[in-house]
Amino acid sequence: MSRVSQARNLGKYFLLIDNMLVVLGFFVVFPLISIRFVDQMGWAAVMVGIALGLRQFIQQGLGIFGGAIADRFGAKPMIVTGMLMRAAGFATMGIAHEPWLLWFSCLLSGLGGTLFDPPRSALVVKLIRPQQRGRFFSLLMMQDSAGAVIGALLGSWLLQYDFRLVCATGAVLFVLCAAFNAWLLPAWKLSTVRTPVREGMTRVMRDKRFVTYVLTLAGYYMLAVQVMLPIMVNDVAGAPSAVKWMYAIEACLSLTLLYPIARWSEKHFRLEHRLMAGLLIMSLSMMPVGMVSGLQQLFTLICLFYIGSIIAEPARETLSASLADARARGSYMGFSRLGLAIGGAIGYIGGGWLFDLGKSAHQPELPWMMLGIIGIFTFLALGWQFSQKRAARRLLERDA
């Protein structure tokens, strides 16, 4: 086995272990934030939505800067620094008794993610061969789902005693992850050339097709990030312990269906068709959520939503990676998170505001119908973009 093949092989295992630690650290804390501050402390959902939206927007919106810096200086220092910063954010969250302190803790957490997330994504693109990326992204998603359930179960158990224990556990896991990267991650370059920060960012911004695709995905992420789902499950069930079953459903579906669906669909369908089909299922499953009154009906709709996500997400990741320029991988993968920044922030803040508005106006279906409509519009916009791309390709072939 050549040294390059050996590095790729070892790199896969490193990425999987690193991802599990990150997912556990995140899901121990974040699924319980809305329950802690909305249900236990009585804050308005919009206050928590602002905090979560701020974290999302900072982490993903500034990702192009984190990616461009990593293109210049390498992945390792950015990843280690970012993980320690997130640990500090979680520690601060444990003592948050005022909205401004929760917002500050989410700001720290988001800045940490800005530093470590783009280089980690770029490492996947660097180490995994193009023909294997779809399946590897599926494995990462399966791991995400299993880690989400384990983290949520652990966090729910710790929440019975003290929310500070929840945050301390998340912080310790990110410190361990930082140590793991500092000890074992080689000083790999992310791009084929050591690209200056400004040049990497400029290269992305001039790629109009990539920029349009990323910005359109904001509508997809408005659906994907919904903080209201745990609150809805809690309201219908009447107990916060029911939230863990929502994550258990996601894990079971992901572990049993994600990899087989990815393997089968990559042989029969284009990436863009898989992304659009998943998005359509997600959109249609959101619309009736506010109209259900039983937990069984709600979990059925959540199952449909997760199946849509299982179809769409590996295709989205693979499509984003395939569009990235190898000369500025960090910058491209950082910018690819901008749709998540915009959609996540609007989804969190707007979703929380609509949820409060729907409750006060006795129209609980309002936020869910709006999300479904946004998903349909995003579906149509992506369809138009992909049809334009195919038309341009046919024109070039005809001219040739």
Swiss-Prot record:
Classification via Pfam families: MFS_1 (PF07690)
Residues annotated as transmembrane: 13-33, 99-116, 139-159, 165-185, 214-232, 242-262, 275-295, 298-318, 338-358, 366-386
A GO cellular-component term linked to this record: plasma membrane
Listed CDD domains: MFS_MdtH_MDR_like
GO molecular function terms attached to this record: transmembrane transporter activity
PROSITE patterns: MFS (PS50850)
Keyword Cell membrane tagged: yes
Cytoplasmic compartment segments: 1-12, 117-138, 186-213, 263-274, 319-337, 387-400
Keyword Transferase: no
Compartment annotation: Cell inner membrane
Membrane topology: Multi-pass membrane protein
Periplasmic topological domain residue ranges: 34-98, 160-164, 233-241, 296-297, 359-365
Stored PANTHER family: MULTIDRUG RESISTANCE PROTEIN MDTH, RESISTANCE PROTEIN MDTM, PUTATIVE-RELATED-RELATED
Stated family: Belongs to the major facilitator superfamily. DHA1 family. MdtH (TC 2.A.1.2.21) subfamily.
Protein name per its UniProtKB record: Multidrug resistance protein MdtH
Species, as recorded: Shigella boydii serotype 4 (strain Sb227)
